[in-house]
């Protein structure tokens, strides 16, 4: 008996009462090489369709592939950073299938002899605890082309009037990183999935092997999910959810799929082994095609390529190129700055850590740099619908703003106006201040005293309270002076003048 694909969902707590969530994560990473995996075609993102192709990546008769050595180096460095064993003898294999996104009707991948095996990645969960995710393998392969389905309601082939194919991406170097089964996480399974992809993205970014842009497809996550009845030993039927294009979506997709599968099982149905597509708009998954097995792909060794046999000396040479890894770097910076675990987690979760570090390196204090990036600039990024690092302002420019505040030329309120001018493309903060002298903090005590006297005269009751020793009442007068000077006064200096005027 099978059930409707989308029965009434169970609450996640109801799922956990009867089932153990089981995960497996597959992450495809496009390598940032200049040319494709097996040919000299460029890999520029966003080029006109079918302008970065040649006989090799189109699979024309007589064309022969040549391995991109830079891609192999990147794959080995990824394996080393994931604590994997690097194979002394690996081979490419043909993965045969008949989808139009690969014009050869096969994909050159690795099957039973991958470049890296048996590693792990320790990830930090929201409460600061560590979870070890074991890595089964990391293997090299070529990417597929892109299909654009025209018409229909979802942009997928169902209901489309026709499809367009762009083979620019076909042959771009990929590393696929596959975890071992992730079980025992219970209620935290979706969180573990998100934390793993987050940590992996940070690691790959630090290695400088990919730009890991999930929104552009250079890092793509597939989440395998199944449910195992409490006390059982046999794994349930798994589904593979694709089209998970953000860190938040990883957690949402896994949680939804667990709830959906439980509802199917509780309704007396069977979970179908299939690929499913994540729908960003409503956080659900929809059915795709039935999931193939390895036998369906009829793997066999690639006859046109020699085995990959990295020497121990080469592997150790590449190990020496590994940078300070993200978790080591974070621990060092946390100690240097003297901030809490919670503050560091917030910076990482906001994708602000690298920006704050660069701002500090440009001369700002850690506290000031952090405050700008996680508050006002984060608000601006959210308003514009972009990532924090995509804002048109650099860490050096933020450091300039901090320096202008420290020098007394700007206060915090006016500094935000300066930042707005920078975001509008009007130049560096110092240039903005030069072009807009009205933004500079008023330092003329004569003018400030006149504004203070006027505010006190307009508020005699408050003036009397201040004279009677109630200094806190000065806040109202300070606020009035700030309004009168359009925010250009130094609040601390204004308060001093208010107290002086009241005989304090």
UniProtKB/Swiss-Prot annotation:
Coiled coil regions, renumbered to chain: none
Assigned protein family: Belongs to the GatB/GatE family. GatB subfamily.
Presence of the UniProt keyword Transferase in the record: no
Key words of the record: ATP-binding, Ligase, Nucleotide-binding, Protein biosynthesis
EC class (word): ligase
The protein's name: Aspartyl/glutamyl-tRNA(Asn/Gln) amidotransferase subunit B
A single BP term in Gene Ontology: translation
Superkingdom of the source species: Bacteria
Function: Allows the formation of correctly charged Asn-tRNA(Asn) or Gln-tRNA(Gln) through the transamidation of misacylated Asp-tRNA(Asn) or Glu-tRNA(Gln) in organisms which lack either or both of asparaginyl-tRNA or glutaminyl-tRNA synthetases. The reaction takes place in the presence of glutamine and ATP through an activated phospho-Asp-tRNA(Asn) or phospho-Glu-tRNA(Gln).
GO MF, any single term: ATP binding
UniProt catalytic activity: L-glutamyl-tRNA(Gln) + L-glutamine + ATP + H2O = L-glutaminyl-tRNA(Gln) + L-glutamate + ADP + phosphate + H(+); L-aspartyl-tRNA(Asn) + L-glutamine + ATP + H2O = L-asparaginyl-tRNA(Asn) + L-glutamate + ADP + phosphate + 2 H(+)
Enzyme Commission code: 6.3.5.-
SUPFAM superfamilies, per database record: GatB/YqeY motif, Glutamine synthetase/guanido kinase
